[in-house]
């Protein structure tokens, strides 16, 4: 297996065959921006976003260059989420002032394993660091969403909260009841689309068409790539084949992927 964190390095294009959400938004006049409190070079994330949607990438080094943090400042992955949310408010205000469609994508990190990052806002509610961090970050996210809802641009803005993967701190979840189904968190706020059907079995791949659908895009056949629009009644691949079978298929070598995506 290739070292995925080293993919796209040097002069190599990052997944040249991919056509992403960012590119679709760019073609429709959106200003794309990525805000992260770490170095954009990790796993070449910055390169991916710059090549797929012409994102302006505001990372840890950007924060130093713009004097938002001291040159010797380094906490956790770079700087903590408390600062990230403050910088996001400034960035959103600037993007909205242009009078053009915009997309701000953010990555929070305080809740990453192991045990999370204890910031100045954390309270000792539970006597356990990770629980305190999770509660603190939840409050910060809620406060940030409430701030957006008070802004003039909120009327035409969709907010999507999405976890990138399950928490990898397995020891923290060792006392979970048998049969408890852990999932990544997904919430779509202020979309004109509403889903009133049964609970869904879905994967991160389904967020591609679901995000665009939440923005009002029409999706022929309800699918893009390997993802299914969760606002539709079309089964996801996980629902159609089961998670285990889908997992197995995804791990197989794909000539199409190698030729058309990796190129």
Residue ranges and their predicted role:
Residues 1-263:
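Solvent-exposed soluble domains appended to multi-pass membrane proteins
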